[in-house]
Each structure stands twice: as C-alpha cells, then as structure tokens.
C-alpha cells in the first residue's frame, strides 16, 4: 500500500507553511519578552502588544487562504488606495515629532507608508508578470515610475528612511525579474551621481545632522548624538550572556531612548548578550532562507519575484535597524521587524508572510494553470 502523492496534508488544507509559522512564533515570543522588559513592565503596553500579535496572526492566516492570482488582480486597486492615503497624509495627516506620517481616523491610527511596503512590490510584480522576463527598457521605465510615485510621497512627509525602504521593496522585485547587469550598473552610477543633489538640496538639516553624528556622536553627546551613544553603551555592556532579562541598566533606568521601538535591539543585546543576539540572527536567517526557498519553488513569475522581493526587503530591514543601533548606519527610524513595538509595521509584515505562504501552498494550483 503506497501513499497518495496528491493527498493533502493538514498544512496544505489550511494553506500555512509550518516551518515559517514556527519561526515566526519564536520571533514573536522573543519580541514579547523584550517588549515587557523595554517597557518597564508596562501592563497596558504588553496587552496592546499581545493584541497586535494576535491581529497579525489572524491577518496572516486569512491572507494565506487567498490564491496568488487574486493578489495579482487586486494589486492595482491596493496601489491606488495607497497613493490616495499617502496624499491624504500630506493634506490632513497627524503630526508627530515634527513629521506628518499618520492618519488618525478616530478608532484607528496608522501609517499609510507601511501599506506602501506591500502595495508597491505587489504592483510591480503584477506588471512584470504580464511582460516577458527580463522586462523591456520601456516597461522597466514604467515599473520605476510605479515605484517612485509612492516613494516621493513618503519622502515628503518627511520620512527618508521609510521612503528608501519603499523604493527598495519595488526595486528588489524588479531586480529578480532578470534585469541585465549593464542596466543595473547604469542605475548604480545614476544613484551615486544623485547623492550630492540629495545631500545639498533635498535633505533636511536634521537628516544631515544624523549622518554627521554617525562619524562623531561625541560632538553632541546630550543632543543629536545621545541616542547612538546610549545604544552603544547598552550593546557593549551586554557581554557574552548579558545582564539578565529585566536587569539592563540602560533600559531599566531609562537612559536609552525609543527602547521599545527603534532601539529595542540595544535592550536585547544588553540583557541577553551575544548569545541572545545570535539566537535572534539565527531566527532571521532561517526565516529569510525559508522564504527564498519558497520563492525558488514558485510556479509563476509573480510568485517568484513577490516572495523573493519580500524576503530581500526583510533582510534590509534587519540590516538597517541593527546597523543603525550599532552605530554603523545613520539613525533613520527603521524598527526591528517582528520585534519592535508597533501595530502598523507588524500587521503589514504578517500580511506579507501570509502572501508568501499563499504562494507556497497554492503552488499545485498554479502549476496546473501555467
């Protein structure tokens, strides 16, 4: 008696990838533990964090049930909604810490720029899937317009860090479509030539100051350099095994700013040490490798470039946050994915993982349609 190779397993029926789900749950538990410490054992914040995790998991499960071809069909509508929301932010968005990035609808407050991190790669993947790969020069130009329209709207908030990530979320999808290295080389040269224009004419004074603080934070230890100095102290004092959960001096004595959001990695490093850092990095590596494996097995161009693009941008999120907190990159306000406190970012990330699981678990259906 032999097993039926076409027989669906439980995970096939619920359209979830158990390996990815297990890694995600481990990261979310890790996040909850560090948030509890970073918040000073704030019960209210912890309750909200658990609610965000629960909502994120529900959205991921729901998104995983929807076939990839539906996402491909929805992409233009989501993209248009995203553009409208970004314009709405510019018109009557809520101002926080000098930036106009939020829409406050009374019952919910969110950042439309987070939606762009899903809407842009979806739209570019849909556009690419309807063309031969690699895309023609004309269609590459159209794809770039689709990428940079929302990017410029986010940059105008101003939010340079998020705008770069939005651009990269689309550019990675375009890269995975098989662009020639010659074209990529030309793009790199153009970007390099644009940097002086960005520095002298487009960046705000505080953004330039952040870059300068990267070189010499001690020049303003109580002002612009304070964040990175305190973060370095926290990371360096953690040692091999850390000071112990809930026993970090920089975090518990509130020397470390934004310790539950952008600088949560410093809290983790101080309290759990190098061992805790390596566990976190191992989970991220496993998650990204699993996502790239799913991308490699996808049966359509849409599935391949979408899953691959989401995993590459996840790597960039992790790299930028850890680099920022460690003092090797400027402070740009990028949270640590799946770990930092924040509902909008977590829900969008979990939605992205739901799409990746959908691409994986619907691959048999896709192979029949090709």
Swiss-Prot record:
Reported impact of residue 102 to A: Significantly reduced glycosyltransferase activity
Recorded GO CC terms: cell division site; plasma membrane
Keywords of the record: Cell inner membrane, Cell membrane, Cell shape, Cell wall biogenesis/degradation, Glycosyltransferase, Membrane, Peptidoglycan synthesis, Transferase, Transmembrane, Transmembrane helix
Catalytic reaction list: [GlcNAc-(1->4)-Mur2Ac(oyl-L-Ala-gamma-D-Glu-L-Lys-D-Ala-D-Ala)](n)-di-trans,octa-cis-undecaprenyl diphosphate + beta-D-GlcNAc-(1->4)-Mur2Ac(oyl-L-Ala-gamma-D-Glu-L-Lys-D-Ala-D-Ala)-di-trans,octa-cis-undecaprenyl diphosphate = [GlcNAc-(1->4)-Mur2Ac(oyl-L-Ala-gamma-D-Glu-L-Lys-D-Ala-D-Ala)](n+1)-di-trans,octa-cis-undecaprenyl diphosphate + di-trans,octa-cis-undecaprenyl diphosphate + H(+)
Subcellular location: Cell inner membrane
Bilayer topology annotation: Multi-pass membrane protein
Cysteine pairs bridged by disulfides in the record: none
Annotated phenotype, changing residue 109 to A: No effect on glycosyltransferase activity
Disruption phenotype: At 42 degrees Celsius, mutation causes formation of spherical cells and mecillinam resistance.
Topological region Periplasmic: 41-49, 96-111, 157-159, 204-262, 333-335
PROSITE patterns, per the entry: FTSW_RODA_SPOVE
Biological process according to GO: cell division; peptidoglycan biosynthetic process; peptidoglycan-based cell wall organization; regulation of cell shape
Pathway: Cell wall biogenesis; peptidoglycan biosynthesis
First-tier enzyme category under EC: transferase
Transmembrane regions: 20-40, 50-70, 75-95, 112-130, 136-156, 160-180, 183-203, 263-283, 312-332, 336-356
Effect of residue 257 to A: Loss of glycosyltransferase activity
Reported regulation of activity: No effect on activity by EDTA indicating that the activity is not metal-dependent.
Domain of life where this protein originates: Bacteria
PANTHER family, per database record: CELL CYCLE PROTEIN (PTHR30474), PEPTIDOGLYCAN GLYCOSYLTRANSFERASE MRDB (PTHR30474:SF1)
Family designation: Belongs to the SEDS family. MrdB/RodA subfamily.
Protein name (record): Peptidoglycan glycosyltransferase MrdB
Gene of this entry: mrdB
